[in-house]
Design a protein with these regions (language model features):
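Membrane-proximal, non-transmembrane interface segments of integral membrane proteins
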Residues: 2-90
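Soluble C-terminal extramembrane regulatory/interaction domains of multi-pass membrane proteins
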Residues: 66-180
């Protein structure tokens, strides 16, 4: 948290992330509570697995944002944007800009991914709360679980893709710094 909060470039995202953490905790507590009332052990097991995955993904993404923001040199970035400093030739400057843009993009993507996760979690909790006692496998619950599972899977794919992009960016960064 502090790494994101101390950099003005990320102040809006930091506020959103803090708000998301509070909401996520509340939604998880509600969903866990509603899961305890599940009518079948199959539904309960599926919900608990999804909730554990949602929690892992949410906090992994927060970790990504914090790590990315920690790497961000705001002083250098601001000087670069003002034109006070340059990084040699245009190619080096372009690579450096791509790195900065990538870090900002990662933090924004985490906020987006976690918001999407919270909304799906909310839908699941609502469906669990509204389900009919006569039909333990209420279609709304199944649909909400499926949508949450889809968001989790999509986010996991995005994380893998982000890791590949980061590896490439770090290779470029290493070449910029002479391999140090």
């Amino acid at each position: 948290k502090p790494a994101v909060k101390t950099k003005s470039v990320f102040s809006e995202q930091a506020d959103q992330i803090l708000y998301q953490i509070r909401r996520f905790g509340s939604k998880m507590a509600t969903a866990y509570s509603m899961t305890q009332d599940s009518k079948t052990s199959g539904e309960q097991a599926k919900c608990l697995t999804l909730l554990a995955s949602a929690e892992r993904i949410f906090y992994d993404r927060l970790d990504d944002a914090i790590r990315s923001a920690s790497m961000f040199d705001e002083t250098e970035y601001n000087a670069f944007c003002r034109g006070s400093i340059s990084f040699g030739d245009k190619e080096e400057a372009k690579k450096k800009k791509e790195i900065y843009d990538g870090i900002v993009s990662t933090v924004n993507k985490v906020v987006h991914d976690n918001e999407r996760l919270i909304l799906r979690l909310d839908s699941l909790a609502y469906a669990l709360n509204q389900r009919s006692a006569q039909n333990p496998w209420d279609t709304d619950v199944v649909l909400a679980m499926t949508k949450l599972d889809t968001v989790i899977s999509k986010t996991e794919e995005d994380i893998k893709q982000d890791e590949e992009i980061s590896k490439e960016a770090m290779k470029r960064y290493d070449t910029l710094n002479g391999g140090n």
